[in-house]
Amino acid sequence: MGAAAAGTRVFLEVRRRLQSALLVLGEPKEGGMSMDISITPCSLQVKTPEGCTELQLPAEVRLVPSSCGGLRYVPGDGLHLRLQVRAESNAKLVSMFNQSSQAQECCTFYCQSCGEVIIRDRELIRVLPLPSENWGALVEEWCCHPDPFANKPLHPQENDCFIGDSFFLVNLRSDLWQPRPELAPVETCCPSSENHFKLKPKANTKVICKRCKVMLGETMSSETTKLYMTEIIIQPSERNFPIIPRSQFVQSVIAQCLVELSTARSTFRFTVQGHDGKVYILLWILNSDSLVIESLRSSKSIKKFSLLEDVLKADSGSAWNAVKVLYQPCIKSRNEKLSSAWESDISIHSLTLPSATCLELLLILSRNNATLPPSLRYMNSFQVPINFSYRARVT
């Protein structure tokens, strides 16, 4: 990807399934300024008296210049233009845990925030997904014998890793650094990825990184620990700890979770709640096939936070696969009625994360929304953070 350092802001959203694209050319700083636009199959060029902006498209995306249509001027945005594209649908979603390659390997679990080793050289023989929350009902409906696993939680053995919607379940060994607090478990309904254990809230069940003091997960029993995907990086032991900016990691993990769940369960609405049980965000997936290409993203008008500065620096002239979602914040008593309605709707899935991570995610969504052209930021009463990336940037 390449873009000139000066010129007009160019925003291009490519929809792979629809083979179409929306092009937004930002308003010039001075009204009435002339603008020359050149569109070729592999590039976009915008010339103004201030300078030239050029985008080189990724190899898998080609524009159809003759299909340009729907030209209109939107105050605050600039020019909107639609055109057809030829885009390969080769954006494969990388699983949160590559079962085929990482099973049978010695892996090390790191704290994503600081790189502290949480579990060292653990050989994972079985890497298995936990069943969905409805599996118990399906067994009763389709099987002629009683469910032998009713009300029995699934405890991973020493070399197991069970994968939930937003967490890993691993078995604690005596040589693990994490202390084992006393627990107060209550009766379990059915072991599942969403409702695997019911515990009375107790401060000493938290798993805390001893270096940076970030909450990594929760101790579920004397041997079983839940580690949240947003807080942990699992690597083969022969590899070094990968340094990934925090905001990039969080939105990538959450977007992967959302896409996998929406594909597996045909659900597109989610509540994001903290480990304290409070709902922080309502999310509604619009699509997951977008490729966003942008140049000259201005961050002057965006309030900067240390969590996001790494992304603000790297976003000029970039392309990335994205999940487009609608969201509503539910903090400080906002959207209480809507949140209650969503919580009581059985078709809406819940994701549980550490409460601090929920606030990080809300900040990321707000920042992503603020970088969109103004006319694309809202749909009805929801906000639209389109650049919710789920894979590495496209180069």
What are these regions (language model features)?
Residues M1-T395:
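N-terminal pre-domain and mature-chain start segments
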